[in-house]
Amino acid sequence: MKKSLLALAVLSAFAGAASAQSSVTLSGRVDAGLIRQNGAWNMGGSQSGYNALTFSGREDLGGGMNAFFTLNHRFGINDGSINNPGGASNFCRNVFVGLGGGFGDVRLGRMLMPLQEWNGAFDAFDTGYVASTHTGGIMATVRSTNTIYYRSPSLGGFFAHAGI
């Protein structure tokens, strides 16, 4: 009887640590319009290059750590078709899982490479021109599959990025 009460007391001590806060978000972008051309109305294509549907989530693991994921899918607004460059599969943009904490973030999957992740902060109009000009015209591979990516915590307002 004493052993079972002791076991119950030990298990109840860990019961509170098992609870965590999680969130899942559905977001995206739709860029479409109507065009009147030669007296007829037609559905307009995307001016920004793509429409996207994104699923992302974060789970608080406690102790300042969290797990997260992102699935980003491109589609054609006119017919719902898969709209991926080069015939890539579904979810061809950012698709990764990761672990974050006081050490920074570690991600595994398909994602922007470090140069492109950094450039994105300067590309206010999603054209690529500002980022390309800012880096002296150097355009690395935008996304890479089977990537291990590390982003450091803020180091006096700066971050270190590395990906292989």
What residues fall within each predicted segment?
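Long, low-complexity, polar and repeat-rich extracellular regions
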Residues: 1-2
